[in-house]
């Protein structure tokens, strides 16, 4: 538990004796109060671990090839930063950092520390509150794909409407499908053949 992690450390010690190279996620380092939610957060973190290591190694390789001598930091769900090694151990804490980056960027670019921010993507739009320059955090329990978890996440309202959402039936039906990242190829404004929200905005 977050209050007494002794049993988790004992379990980790036993695992390390048997499987010294295994990636081990301790739930008290990720989740908050709530056994099931914290367990789900730990399982999700463990599932993302190998992919996170691969992505971070690719970042490091690309930076080295460019001759850039700088540390790598990744943004967390709460708008703060973490080192590459921390992100490799706790990838679940970067899970929703895309909308968070938009919100933090809105604070920096606008000069407002308190605001309502709308992040319009290709398929969806995320709406959230910026308080003191950081996204407001969701309540204790957050559903991720229908699974209850309790790691830090921004409190967002996701709407199935984005710049690439397809418009049909003379404008009476929008989405749910989208041209997504093919917006510059398929939208009418770019010479394509699909009517999208970007075309009528």
What do these predicted ranges mean?
Residues 1-201:
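N-terminally biased helix-coil "hinge/interface" segments that flank
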